[in-house]
Amino acid sequence: LSTVVKGNRLKNALVYVQVTRGVAPRNHSFPAPAVPPSLVVTAKPFDLQKCEAQAEKGVAVVTRPDIRWGRVDIKTIGLLPNALAKEAARREGASEAWLVREGKVTEGAASNAWIVTRSGEVVTHPLGTDILGGVTRQTVIACAEELQIKISERPFSLKEVAEAAELFLTSASNLVMPIVKIDGRDVGRGEPGPIARRLREAYLKRCALA
C-alpha cells in the first residue's frame, strides 16, 4: 500500500484494494486447477480540508428500499443496488441514501448509519449479514467508548430516525459526517450536532489527522 501511495506522490490518500479469483476462461464455477488471485491497489488524493468544510455544514440523505442481496457483509464489486440508491440521492440533491429493510435502517449506500437519541445514546446497526462492517465503524465505536458516550449496536427504525437528536454517517472518505437533512426534513436544528462533532474530533486525533 505504501508503495502505491509513494508512487503516486500522495501525502493524504484514499487507498482501494481489490482482489479477484484470478484470470481464467469465463465460467461461473471456480477454475481447475486453481489460478493465482489478481490484486489491484489504487490510490487517489484525499482532501481533508474539503472534507472538514463539508462536515461544518453537514450533509443531506434520503431513504431508499434496501434491495441488495442477503450477504452484504461480503465486500464484493456487485454494487448495482448501491449505485442506484446513490444516484437517486444525487438527483434529489443529497449526498447519500440510507437503505431501509422491513422498516429498519440497515446502512448507507456507501457508509454506515448512526443516530443519536434524545437521551444521548449513539445507535448503529449491529454487525451481521445486513451491513458491511469496516475499520471506520470500528474506530468510531472505540472513540465513543473512550469519550464515555453510551453506544448500542442494534437495529433502529424510521420512527427512531425521525425522533433522533442527531444523525451521522461514517465511511473512509467521509470520516464522521453529520447529517442535517433526511428526506427533505431538518434533523434537529438543521445543523451538525455536538456528539457527531465530538466523535469526529476524536476520530481525527486517533487517526493522527488532526
PLM regions and their residue ranges:
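Glycine- and Gly-Pro-enriched alpha-helical subdomains that act as flexible
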Residues: 98-127, 131-133
